[in-house]
Amino acid sequence: MKYNLTKKISYSIIILVLLVGLSLTAIFGMNGKGYGSAKDINLGLDLAGGVSITYEIKEDNPSSQDIEDTIYKLEKRIEGRSTESQVYKEGENRITVEIPGVTDANEILTELGTPGSLEFLDYTGYTAWSQGEDYTPLLTGSDVKTAQAYTDTSSKDSTPYGVSLTFTDEGGDKFAEATANNIGSRIYIVYDGSVVSYPTVNQAITGGNASITSMETFDAADNLATYIRIGSIPLTLNEVSSNIVGAQLGHDAIHTSLIAAAIGFALLCVFMIAIYRVPGVVATLSLIIYTTLVLFLVSVYDLTLTLPGIAGIILGIGMAVDANVIIYTRIREEIAAGKSVENSILAGYDKATSAIVDGNVTTLIAAIVLYIFGTGPVKGFATTLAVGNIVSIFTALVITKVIMKLLYNFGLTKPSMYGKTTHRRTYDILSIKKWTITVSIVLIVIGFITMGVQSALGNRALNFSLEFVGGSTTSFTFDKEYSQSEIENDIIPVIRDAAGITEVQQQKVQNSTKVSFKTTDLSLEQREAVEEAVTAKFPIEDGSIVETDTISSSVSSTMKKNAILSVILATIAMLIYIFARFRDIKFALAAVMALLQDVLVVITFYAVFRVPVGNTFIACMLTIVGYSINGTIIIFDRIREMLKSANSKTNITELVNSAITSTLTRNINTTITTLIMLVMLYILGVTSVKEFSLPLIVGIIVGFYSSVFLTSSFWYMLGGKNRGVIDEAVNKRKKAESIGKDGAQV
């Protein structure tokens, strides 16, 4: 780690340029056009608004299945534009689509208004079709298994873009027969009333594939492929209104959240420097790099940021801090053991790497599974979490190491500059396992009893929000335009008091005096009370009427199923990874048992305090799972390390207690740093942000409790207490020593 003066100066300049460059990029972006800047980040409907389009169903008395299928296919169509869009039923025959960050309603109308029907016609069918007569298509969109856009780089055509089609088995047979019967003739491919391709058949095509060629742009080909894959919309939709709407959570949500984040970040840095000194300074610099990199990537990859997405970033910051805490705790332990600072730094990074990689990879696996199988807010959360994970590993194991070496070689070599290790007596955590497990069981039982009582009283077991159960929408056209602040601070409290409810979402139509308020389902008396109370204080425009209607949940049954499936699969994937890394099913089972406890205890909190359960509920639960699994892996990693040095006289109970105690500082400090950010959001945030941050605060505390008091106890009870665990560890070490002494064995 010896550097000459030239290298010191060079590294200093590189790090300084990196910090300044990333900071300027995060603020101003690149190319002088704001590309990659934080200001260029797409914000969701909850934070920035977007376009709202309402369609009327043309068919009379459509079935609920057709409506649900239509909503699902609209969701899939707009998913490529934004994972944070909402589609829901309004009244009996209307469907509303809301897409964040869009200012051109006509563009969306064109995209979504496409029915999506695909037909293959021979010349006879084409002639009848073009004259408006009855015809029988050779194939339809239902015969297509999948469709993908492509670019033919070998083509000399000015339009080398197309869509490759793969037929179903039945569709392939139909296409083979159709081409065999039309050699020398054309087959017309008709999509939504327009001929998109009419190739001449040279021979029978039996491979089950076909292509639509000569598309004008790749985007056009990609959109067509998407619509073909999804299939046609079963109902005919007529657009009745389209508006640009403001943020659902209001302007203050962003402003106050940014202030809270800035204060929280500053306090976090002060805490790290106070506790870890020189490494704390390194952590502060790495967190600045981490934050700017994450914001840059979110902006560059055009991700839409909503409250669930912010949850993913908060978890990412927590994991970035956690990685630093793990390393610096290890460094202090090595210094306390008598090693030089230089060797302690090297050993600290070496010993911390496996725990950091395991914790982040486990969470990254979960994020990938959630992204693949999740929809809507789950996918948005998974995206920001994955980005944060990758950046966290990079900054912790690469950036901080470079900065740490640099500071050491600049003369910061005194052991006191790297913090002081507090020698704790070993706490006998396992001796109180019956009490800690009993506390968890009692809390979980309280939750189930509360939900049962609520159901018996005619209420829902949990206080499901509009996203899950729908409700009512009430629209007022006022005699003047009110600001977002006036709507939030003056009008919404009147609605809450008149209806006796807590959850009210608002949408302000831009350049209009019309404001819509979404609430839980209101009775006739509640609607009349709201109308009377609001119009008494805030007069409406002459000749206008107060519009009221029912709305369905924006989280469809399919999205709910996908969310549950994705969480289950993510948990299984984490279990498999933990088993593969630790080679012990007891570790995996203990981790999953602790995660289940975390989720159920937080659900108890939701049930007892009637906190609204909406889109952020899913993100909250996933954040807690990610945080808890990280803490669990740290302790398990320490148990595994101690088992490697165990001997025949080692007491397994003392070993486990020692592992828990030695990682206690890390668990406490990581919990404090994560809570700093969340508590500031709760103190300064608007109501919706408070409802989002409070369960996270509870979940982080519950995660700390389970990591310290439950996971190792579960492992111990599942068989870790058996003498065979020590014997197996001793035999493995002896075998490894034998191999090292005698050379390779055949």
Predicted regions and their residues:
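A structural signal for conserved, well-ordered secondary-structure elements
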Residues: M1-V746
